[in-house]
Amino acid sequence: MTKTWPPRTVIRKSGGLRGMRTLESALHRGGLGPVAGVDEVGRGACAGPLVVAACVLGPGRIASLAALDDSKKLSEQAREKLFPLICRYAVAYHVVFIPSAEVDRHGVHVANIEGMRRAVAGLAVRPGYVLSDGFRVPGLPMPSLPVIGGDAAAACIAAASVLAKVSRDRVMVALDADHPGYGFAEHKGYSTPAHSRALARLGPCPQHRYSFINVRRVASGSNTAEVADGQPDPRDGTAQTGEGRWSKSSHPATMRATGRAQGT
């Protein structure tokens, strides 16, 4: 009988870090390692960059990351404590920042998929298999699997989610100093009531995404749109859901963070 990959593995989300390693361990046993996890932060924000991280965790270094979990379930303090540990113990990691203008130009989904491809391509160690959080990532030169709720089911995805979240939060704090009055340090660019009030008072800044209807509504001086605040405008071509890729000449000028653990 022909074997297929990945194997049918039971993911026990309540099993702590050991449960999160089940799928990765099965892939390693099948000779498909190293296994990279990839995740993004900032899809739903109406301001600030979309941040994508890829991370490879070594099987022998997991004990140092006992507190690892989905970044959304961790406090800011816990994420900040985990961030340097992940950078230290990861076999490799790479973080890509996609500016708001590029998100507007290509659409959130296309930008997200391209960011995942670029994050994986930027790893110092070539993975044998890639696990992504929920989204299929076409165009990778190695096999991959989208895992629904992956940041709570696979340790490498959880690590990538922490890297992306902390990296983006730090950028938003810095942008708060560059663009005072919007409260970026507090809401991180998401559409909170405080952000909406500041946006109405000050108007959009260069960090806002004009493909989001609440930003466009303020920019145009119109308040008659019936599309929910903080969502991409479905009437706008930039809100497409296709899986297109950018040409080489149109890759966004992004900031990057790359690392490889010492001794690997």
Curated annotation (Swiss-Prot):
Q: Which GO terms describe its molecular function?
A: manganese ion binding; RNA binding; RNA-DNA hybrid ribonuclease activity
Question: What EC number(s) does this enzyme carry?
Answer: 3.1.26.4
Cofactor binding summary note:
Manganese or magnesium. Binds 1 divalent metal ion per monomer in the absence of substrate. May bind a second metal ion after substrate binding.
Cellular component terms, GO, for this chain's entry? Answer: cytoplasm; ribonuclease H2 complex
The alphabetized list of GO BP terms reads: DNA replication, removal of RNA primer; mismatch repair
User: Could you tell me which residue ranges the RNase H type-2 domain spans?
Assistant: 33-224
* Region annotation Disordered: where it falls in the sequence: 222-264
Q: Where does a divalent metal cation bind?
A: D39, E40, D133
Location comes to: Cytoplasm
Alphabetical list of CDD domains matching this protein: RNase_HII_bacteria_HII_like (cd07182)
Cofactor (UniProt)? Mn(2+); Mg(2+)
Catalysis: reaction(s): Endonucleolytic cleavage to 5'-phosphomonoester
Question: Could you tell me the keywords of this UniProt record?
Answer: Cytoplasm, Endonuclease, Hydrolase, Manganese, Metal-binding, Nuclease
- Report the protein's function: Endonuclease that specifically degrades the RNA of RNA-DNA hybrids.
Q: Known PANTHER family for this protein?
A: RIBONUCLEASE H2 SUBUNIT A, RIBONUCLEASE HII
The family annotation for this protein states: Belongs to the RNase HII family.
Q: Please state what the protein is called.
A: Ribonuclease HII
Write the lineage as a comma-separated list.
Answer: Bacteria, Bacillati, Actinomycetota, Actinomycetes, Mycobacteriales
